[in-house]
């Protein structure tokens, strides 16, 4: 029986193979081959046309006496490790917690140049934290859409903080932060901060922060509301306006405008308060339209070598550029509009030099001659005019 069953099994094997071969086409029809491979990340290169060397900012920085580390995804909290007798300055109300010996910690409220910073709309209330033993502090902001970035200052490169509320915390005995007045921007953006020395900085921006590295000879165009900070080794950023499609309409000149301007009616009308109010209203409407409708064409141009920190969310155009700067950029031809700014500065310089020249001419015109008095024997006094007038 065993031999018989073995022979039956061997005889059924070809049938089983053929049966499996019959089912294999249906199974092959249901199968899909998936090929998975790792993609190579794009390498940042030149900024002029080919690549954009933009990357995320550093999430940690260290010095011999302190260490800054950004935690969270997206970055939402800052961890600060301080050594003994090291000072930490953080904005008032941003300290979340602290670990270490609490009895050795000293916290005081510091007023950093309140007069100048208040005029420039820069925060001046900071909390100074120091300890005789090593501590670790956690710092955060009240806003839910801000992220952190840390900058290590080694003394070779100085930074300019473009946003007045971007500076959150810093440490370093030789670090110096000076408020700077930028009259080219609007009143809400007059205050910039120049940072020099050695130490660590903690900056905050709206949305996500990115770093753009420029080499020598490279250029980068950025919206002024998105710039958080930049190095000041390179030339100052210049206003820039993109080209647009314009359909010029040429109307033959008939001399009507010149005739109307020469008439007495137009001259008397231009001196009235109603005419001046109408011109002022037209100027306001034109500036508003340039900011609102054509505001996306107003940018800033940076020249390398430079490092620029930009934020993904920006403020309004009205909070960044003044009325005068918007009109100067809009009236200038497309491209680099530094010529318009230079002409405005030269005009202002000429107005200042003309009064000085007039003052210098006053002493020379006042002294036009010399009078000599002689007393006669009878007691009368005679005056004789001599000098230039003779």
From Swiss-Prot:
It is found in: Mitochondrion. Residues 348-362 have a biased composition (Basic and acidic residues). One of its GO terms (cellular component) is mitochondrial inner membrane. The keyword DNA damage does not apply. It comes from the Eukaryota. InterPro entries: AIM24 (IPR002838), AIM24_sf (IPR036983), Trp_RNA-bd_attenuator-like_dom (IPR016031). It comes from Blastomyces gilchristii (strain SLH14081) (Blastomyces dermatitidis). Its main location: mitochondrion. The gene is aim24. Belongs to the AIM24 family. This is Altered inheritance of mitochondria protein 24, mitochondrial. Residues 1-28 form a transit peptide. One of its GO terms (biological process) is inner mitochondrial membrane organization. Residues 348-373 are annotated as: Disordered. The keyword Transit peptide applies. Keywords: Mitochondrion, Transit peptide.
């Amino acid at each position: 029986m065993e031999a018989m069953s073995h022979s039956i099994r061997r005889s059924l094997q070809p049938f089983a193979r053929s049966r499996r071969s019959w089912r294999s086409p249906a199974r092959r029809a249901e199968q899909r081959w998936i090929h998975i491979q790792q993609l190579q990340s794009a390498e940042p290169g030149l900024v002029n046309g080919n690549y954009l060397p933009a990357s995320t900012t550093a999430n940690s920085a260290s010095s011999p006496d302190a260490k800054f580390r950004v935690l969270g995804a997206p970055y939402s909290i800052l961890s600060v490790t301080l050594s003994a007798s090291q000072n930490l300055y953080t904005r008032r109300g941003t300290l979340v917690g602290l670990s270490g010996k609490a009895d050795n910690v000293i916290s005081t409220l510091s007023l950093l140049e309140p007069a100048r910073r208040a005029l420039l709309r820069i925060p001046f209330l900071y909390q100074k934290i120091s300890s005789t033993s090593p501590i670790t502090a956690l710092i955060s902001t009240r806003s839910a859409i801000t992220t952190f970035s840390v900058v290590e200052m080694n003394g070779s490169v100085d930074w300019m903080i473009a946003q007045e509320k971007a500076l959150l915390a810093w440490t370093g005995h030789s670090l110096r932060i000076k408020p700077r007045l930028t009259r080219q921007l609007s009143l809400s953006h007059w205050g910039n901060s120049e940072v020099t020395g050695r130490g660590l900085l903690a900056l905050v921006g709206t949305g996500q922060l990115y770093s753009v590295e420029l080499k020598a000879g490279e250029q980068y165009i950025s919206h002024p509301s998105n710039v958080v900070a930049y190095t000041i080794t390179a030339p100052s950023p210049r206003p820039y306006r993109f080209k647009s499609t314009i359909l010029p309409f040429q109307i033959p000149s008939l001399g009507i405008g010149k005739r109307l301007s020469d008439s007495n009616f137009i001259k008397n009308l231009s001196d009235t308060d109603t005419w001046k109010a109408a011109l002022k209203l037209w100027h306001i409407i034109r500036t508003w339209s340039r900011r609102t409708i054509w505001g996306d064409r107003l940018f800033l141009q940076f020249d390398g070598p430079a490092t620029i920190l930009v934020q993904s969310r920006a403020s309004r155009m009205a909070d960044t550029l003044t009325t005068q700067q918007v009109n100067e950029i809009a009236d200038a031809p497309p491209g680099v509009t530094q010529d318009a700014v230079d002409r405005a500065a030269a005009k202002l310089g000429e107005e200042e030099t003309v009064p000085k020249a007039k003052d210098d001419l006053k002493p020379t015109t006042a002294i036009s001659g010399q009078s000599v008095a002689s007393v006669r024997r009878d007691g009368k006094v005679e005056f004789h005019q001599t000098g230039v007038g003779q």
